[in-house]
Amino acid sequence: MAKIDFDRSKEHVNIGTIGHVDHGKTTLTAAIATVLAKHVEGNEARDYGSIDNAPEERERGITINTSHIEYNTEKRHYAHVDCPGHADYVKNMITGAAQMDGAILVVAATDGPMPQTREHILLSKQVGVPKMVVFLNKVDLLGSGSEAEEMADLVEFEIRDLLSQYEFDGENTPVVRGSALKALNGEKAWEDKVMELMSQVDNWIDAPLREVDKPFLMAVEDVFTITGRGTVATGKVERGELKINEEVDIVGYTEKPKRTTVTGIEMFRKNLKTALAGDNAGLLLRGINREQIERGQVLAKPGTIVPHTKFKAAIYALKKEEGGRHTPFFKNYKPQFYFRTTDVTGGIELPNNIEMVTPGDNVDLIVDLISPIAVEVGTKFSIREGGRTVGAGSVTEIVK
């Protein structure tokens, strides 16, 4: 575990890059860290390779796993997650976006909004990202002059329209035009655009009201072992606070929770005395083997949440144009349901008066999962099938 204590003097905000594959999300992430390192103390420059760090990614040139970095503006400390852009990895987008208080939507001016741009905006709405700032990337490739300006204006108009369709504030959302690659390469005019972007992020994206007074809950994103110390579970603290030596329940996948004591807490390799709502924390768990905890379970204040398999839900079935199904689904349909950091297969029961659900429908139905999961009223989820998002929903009532 870490040696240095974490500094909490600045307001902490979780943010991330989203958008279509190859529009420049990872390059922009590297540019933000690198440009801020020149202007604000306490930042470390990053290159593309250090963020695009999973082996599969570089072989295929596509970002797969979510990558976490940190940086500071004059006003705030940010934890930044670089979200996957490739359609096959929307599953990871769901776990990554669930960690965001706001997003930077990256759109290449050369392409305009693409299918994954739309899907990421929809998913951001679904997982509760309240606001986003748009970075219109690669504007240098449009050339100069009035035609280039008109092209950029047109793309900006399309993006604003798309944001409004999904109930974001398309009219007032800040749009910054720039070149992530040229900023990363140190060209002053483009570096200034990155600073302008971060100023907009500071001002447009609100610091979240952290739910510190509610019972502690953290969804497990990853688990690893520290030799001689024990097992560490990492994830974003959804609500509440946790102090060292307090007990937590490991909930999900089994009928009964398993209880353990937290003997160490860290964030970005620095020690914490307390983990608070909004923190990306690593918790050292006493007496727990690597096999006794897995991604998708949650750590919670003892007795505050129990696993369930059956619940009522309000769902929206995506239209074909939104990347959803082309045909209706009927009772006994068995897709995957994605909660926080987990996916589990479940069957559906339709109300008596409904025979089928057509793409574009809003409907109330009952979900019956094959494994018990920590859910409660208000828990949001996505419905996936064959590698694509086909619906989005929210738990309205627990059945069992």
Swiss-Prot record:
Keywords: Cytoplasm, Elongation factor, GTP-binding, Hydrolase, Magnesium, Metal-binding, Nucleotide-binding, Protein biosynthesis
Subcellular location: Cytoplasm
E.C. number: 3.6.5.3
One Pfam short name: GTP_EFTU
Region feature (G4): 137-140
Example of a GO cellular component annotation carried by this entry: cytosol
Chain positions recorded as GTP binding sites: 19-26, 82-86, 137-140
Region ranges (G5): 179-181
Residues binding Mg(2+): 26
A GO molecular-function annotation: GTPase activity
Catalytic reaction list: GTP + H2O = GDP + phosphate + H(+)
Location of region: G1: 19-26
Chain spans, region G2: 61-65
Group of enzyme by EC: hydrolase
Keyword Glycoprotein: no
Chain ranges of the tr-type G domain: 10-209
Region span, G3: 82-85
HAMAP family to which the protein is assigned, alphabetical: EF_Tu_B
Known function: GTP hydrolase that promotes the GTP-dependent binding of aminoacyl-tRNA to the A-site of ribosomes during protein biosynthesis.
Record family assignment: Belongs to the TRAFAC class translation factor GTPase superfamily. Classic translation factor GTPase family. EF-Tu/EF-1A subfamily.
Cited NCBIfam families: EF-Tu, PRK00049.1, PRK12735.1, PRK12736.1, small_GTP
Annotated protein name in UniProt: Elongation factor Tu
UniProt source species: Mycoplasma mobile (strain ATCC 43663 / 163K / NCTC 11711)
Gene: tuf
